[in-house]
Amino acid sequence: MKFDKWINDSEKYEFCKSYGVANIPSMEFKEHQENFYIYLLSYFHEIMETYLEKGMTDDIKKELLDLADGLILYSQNETYEDFYGVNRGQNFLYVSSIYYLCDYTAISSLLMHDIDIEEFPLEASQILAFIISGGGVEKRQKSYDNEEVSWINVKKFIYQGEEIYLDEEISVQDRKYKERDFDSSTDFYMSLVLRCVLRKFKENNLWTSLRAIDPDFDWSSYVRHSRRQHIFSFLPSQQDALNKGLLNFQRAFSLKMPTSAGKSYITELLIHYVLKNHPEDRILYLAPLRALSRELKDHH
């Protein structure tokens, strides 16, 4: 199929540009870049609808990641100047949302690092950026006064952990989509993506993960500490450690995690939980690297 070849070629093109390969051969998708982008968005819509119906599957995840390889050409530094007619920030938001849905939350947050939320006129885009960045991208207006209902719903859930607010926001977005209450085609796509991200966020957030471990424990101070670090959910490796009983150990445990998998953060959680439950206990934390010990000293 022609579009399958275009997506494969777009991956090759991105690789060549990223590694400075000279004399990149002519590729058909680049000569038809407007049609290619329209196809990508149409394909995106189709996959998102399937995701809402069936949830994440291996096939959907693969299709989404292939799609991200095509979309990112229109935004990343090495390639975006070769394309035209696409809002770079909004396109980055599509790509970041895909990585978020596929559990690559660190990548999705990194892509949003230099984004100014004021670039997004649409409420759906702003809320997406806020959730995906862990609050790193936020409106300058801090109070609830005069804020839209959707912002209030999302923030109250994040700050207070009451699921009724997130459920209400999911209902608001579902109703908007059902009634086709959109200001533009971009609003249509962003609202669809937001519906998917909200469902993912409902399943994967700090409040839900921590309460599953100990529903009677007061997690509010730890969630507040995490928000200051722009963390709204655990990384997959961290969640896996929790699911395997990290906080329920009796005498000792061995924590094996890849580099940059969030060991320091998950250790903070362990220390917090132990000392809250056993304030008379003492903890010896050996930091093997000087940089890590300095980081711990700065944070605590």
Residue ranges and their predicted role:
Residues 1-300:
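N-terminal helicase ATP-binding lobe
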